[in-house]
Amino acid sequence: MGIRYLLVLVLVLLVLGCEVQGAHMPQQDEATSPSLFTQMQESFYGYWGIAKSAAQGLYEKTYLTTVDEKIREIYNKSTAAVSTYAGIFTDQLLSMLKGDQ
């Protein structure tokens, strides 16, 4: 999965680079035309929105309720076990530090 994210990131940066290079516009007044940074930022936000909606659509398409329930169940069991053992460890540590009194 890491290679997919890296590939998507490289492609997005490549498209942004091509868009910035290919946008040769005649010089206009600085006050009327947005700066290059603003154009790049707007372009990035546009691509980010498209990628975000595509990822959300893919997530909704592949969402499995049984897997979600299993993950929640495993999380609940593991947090209960960790809190139990953390309590035992804390009690042991306090009794070692306090000593016999």
Curated annotation (Swiss-Prot):
GO terms for biological process: lipid catabolic process; lipid transport; positive regulation of phospholipid catabolic process. Residues 66-74 are annotated as: Lipid binding. It comes from the Eukaryota. Coiled coil: none annotated. Proapolipoprotein C-II is synthesized as a sialic acid containing glycoprotein which is subsequently desialylated prior to its proteolytic processing. Proapolipoprotein C-II, the major form found in plasma undergoes proteolytic cleavage of its N-terminal hexapeptide to generate apolipoprotein C-II, which occurs as the minor form in plasma. Residues 1-22 form the signal peptide. Keywords: Chylomicron, Glycoprotein, HDL, LDL, Lipid degradation, Lipid metabolism, Lipid transport, Lipoprotein, Secreted, Sialic acid, Signal, Transport, VLDL. One of its GO terms (molecular function) is phospholipase binding. It is found in: Secreted. Pfam families: Apo-CII. GO terms for cellular component: chylomicron; high-density lipoprotein particle; low-density lipoprotein particle; very-low-density lipoprotein particle. Residues 78-101 are annotated as: Lipoprotein lipase cofactor. Component of chylomicrons, very low-density lipoproteins (VLDL), low-density lipoproteins (LDL), and high-density lipoproteins (HDL) in plasma. Plays an important role in lipoprotein metabolism as an activator of lipoprotein lipase. Both proapolipoprotein C-II and apolipoprotein C-II can activate lipoprotein lipase. Belongs to the apolipoprotein C2 family. This is Apolipoprotein C-II. It comes from Mirounga angustirostris (Northern elephant seal). The gene is APOC2.
